[in-house]
Amino acid sequence: MSNYNSWGIHMRSGHCWHSSFPVKKKNKRSSKIPMNEKNLDLLNRIFKSGSEKEYIKSDILNERKFRKNVQDQNKIKSSPRQKTSKLDMHKKKEESVIIIEAGAHAREWISPAVGTYIAQQLADPANSDLLKYATWVVVPLLNPDGYDYSHTDDRFWRKNRRLNKGRPECPGVDLNRNFNIKWAITGSSSNQCSETYHGTKAFSEKETKAIRKLIKRIKNVELYLSLHSYGQVILHPLGYTSDEPPGVGELRSMADAFANHISNNGGRQYAVEQAGLNYQSGGGSDDYAFSRGVPYSYTVELPDKWKDGFETPPEKILGISQEIWTGLKCLLGDLVPDAKYLC
Ligand SMILES: [Zn+2]
């Protein structure tokens, strides 16, 4: 990424904050770059353009309401009684962490829309019970400058917008080919002009470095979801080979449970398959998270199967977001049995 920081929303048992991910250390005392005017301008444009415009119009994503909800959640957190009950509940077991990464590929607009919807639901005090059983980390837009470019210049842009040395006419790295897991082995390109250009080395990009840092820093990540489109399929590791990983049965049964939760609650039918079954690619975030010990790591190719492609009609945004959210709430009960009643 050349111009902007990735940003994340991190919610843990009642508190939430927007943050810029740590980037290149210029000053040893502070590894974070604050949200500056340039970034804020980009975010404002993102939330007022393209598919998100429909959110604002229909009051699904109401910024004022979102801010108020976050404040309310913070009040809950600061209540001593709440703290005690949380401690009692989890004194035997470390809290599970769920990471949701959205918007790695610029043109897949439904992905950040769903990520944003999930963040909004988590900030709603009506859903505060969900924060009792897991720490949720939402990265609603991993590739902001690519996403912006897909609104302003090229609807089907996929990569980020970094300038590639020696080829100014061919910018961009495919973020989902840049992770250090079988990097550049298969399903990516060393040609900077290619849509699947994997970068000069693994983790050459700020965005992928930020995810690496997140996964390394946070212990006990139980579930990692990478939201993409399209295909209406839940893909499990391994993606770089068609060989099955150890523990494939568990990976598959959790993915089947997710798909069933979605369809049993009135949502679409999502297929489940191994990512590398028909097409192999190295350097993906799902395989990376899995290689770092995350037991349940998936890429969700959001709807539809083929007709809409990347151009999800705005009227379908809410339905897709709701079905993923419902499936996720139920899936929490499979990860943390005490949370089954939330389904
Ligand atoms: Zn994608």
Q: Where do the PLM segments sit?
A:
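Extreme N-terminal flexible tails
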Residues: M1-K24, K28-T84
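Flexible, glycine/charged-enriched surface loops at secondary-structure junctions
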Residues: D129, R268-G276
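Intrinsically disordered or highly flexible coil/loop and linker segments, enriched in small
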Residues: A184-I185, G267-R268, P337, Y341
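Mature extracytoplasmic/luminal segments of secretory-pathway proteins
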Residues: H10-S13, S190, K340
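Active-site/substrate-binding loop(s) of hydrolase catalytic cores
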Residues: E94-D256, N260, N264, T299-T312
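His/Asp/Glu-rich mid-to-C-terminal helical/loop segments that flank catalytic regions of hydrolases
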Residues: G309-C343
